[in-house]
């Protein structure tokens, strides 16, 4: 099958990373897949580093007939069977193709409400299938926007269980940053932006430090929207007097090594998050997790069994959960062990891809059947003109 992915995002994060991994998996599995992204985006640079086939194309505007035509031309030349879109701009650009018969799917990877109900039009009438990251998204779309349940498929994110595993050296990253094995490391991995909750975690770190002055927090990820957000977080760290206890590492490719070094992973997201990849990575790496109640986190974490779950925007609750893991090694070990078992049962990347591919293949086959029926349908006979009689 030939699949074209479009990603209009200017920033690089978990969704964009996963899209590239999916494309690479498809190409390695005998299919053909490509990514169209904006030439000015971080996605282009990072995708090329991952070896993903990329086509630069301006995706800055929702409505651009020339770009829609260029997408159609690419599909025609490369015999694309289905288009996969991930956000509003790329979806609207592909709407003309869908209306002309090309199968189009729309991923929904965030839990933010659509706002006005008329924004559901593109989901209701502009795609063959919605692929949601979490059940909470499907529930919202059915109840709030009246979208038919059968139009929504829920397939959560997953990870490479070979890459993310407990086998990595726990001292590799610690040696790099000069932290001994006895120093607790609390890791937060994700883009620096308001919905990820880094400010809440900085406040939680301040509270934790009152009881555990040796605790170190490691923030991994780049800021979206330029460097200003990173500066705000650095200022918050400075105001809290945590410069010696917080490391901001920027974007890193060696996440498995950082997870191996961490005593725990904290997901402090306030909203938006649907299916946190870092939760899967941490579970697969055998790390205990503290997470806020966002997206599919409550569907996965059983409090006190395979992790600790707290309410969003509650720095005190975050701090309490962190201190609980630091003070109760048996609890942390039990949660890590149960999380690892859960990951091996539910977070296999190959299994996720086969589920997504089954959805895509079904849509492609349905499209082909419609095309065959359309071509086979007999043309209605043309009525003979009435004879014109002379006066």
Predicted regions and their residues:
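A conserved mid-protein helix/loop that constitutes part of the nucleotide-sugar donor-binding site
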Residues: 13-21, 184, 188-207, 217, ...
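Carbohydrate-associated surface elements
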Residues: 136, 158
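Glycosyltransferase donor-sugar binding loop
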Residues: 36-42, 189, 216-232
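Conserved acidic donor-binding segment of nucleotide-sugar-dependent glycosyltransferases
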Residues: 303-304, 308-315, 324-330
